[in-house]
From Swiss-Prot:
SMART domains: Sm. The keyword rRNA processing applies. It comes from the Eukaryota. Pfam families: LSM. GO terms for molecular function: RNA binding. The keyword Cytoplasm applies. Component of the heptameric LSM1-LSM7 complex, which consists of LSM1, LSM2, LSM3, LSM4, LSM5, LSM6 and LSM7. Component of the heptameric LSM2-LSM8 complex, which consists of LSM2, LSM3, LSM4, LSM5, LSM6, LSM7 and LSM8. The LSm subunits form a seven-membered ring structure with a doughnut shape. Its main location: cytoplasm. Component of LSm protein complexes, which are involved in RNA processing and may function in a chaperone-like manner, facilitating the efficient association of RNA processing factors with their substrates. Component of the cytoplasmic LSM1-LSM7 complex, which is thought to be involved in mRNA degradation by activating the decapping step in the 5'-to-3' mRNA decay pathway. Component of the nuclear LSM2-LSM8 complex, which is involved in splicing of nuclear mRNAs. This is U6 snRNA-associated Sm-like protein LSm6. SUPFAM superfamilies: Sm-like ribonucleoproteins (SSF50182).
Length: 82
């Protein structure tokens, strides 16, 4: 931080971004390296996530498909909009 200016993304609350992308395709990467791609249905303050039309990828290869998937927030490394 120079001259009191915040760098991009620093100090921002992600809840606004997450509420804007509900209903859209997202990628969720877990701390284990497993990736889920699906339609974001909900996310709470603990980063617990509900997805629909979900695909699971392990080491880059599609492993399974799920109608609904629920991910506990403490396992989430990041969520990105696709």
């Amino acid at each position: 931080m120079e001259n009191g200016a915040a760098t991009q993304g620093e100090g921002k609350d992600p809840s606004g971004f997450l509420s804007e992308i509900i209903g859209n395709p997202v990628t969720v990467k877990l701390n284990s390296g497993v990736v889920y791609k699906g339609e974001l249905q909900s996310v709470d303050g603990y980063m617990n996530i509900a997805l629909e039309k979900t695909e699971e990828y392990v080491n880059g290869a599609k492993r399974r498909s799920y109608g609904d998937a629920f991910v506990r927030g403490n396992n989430v490394m990041y969520i990105s909009a696709d």
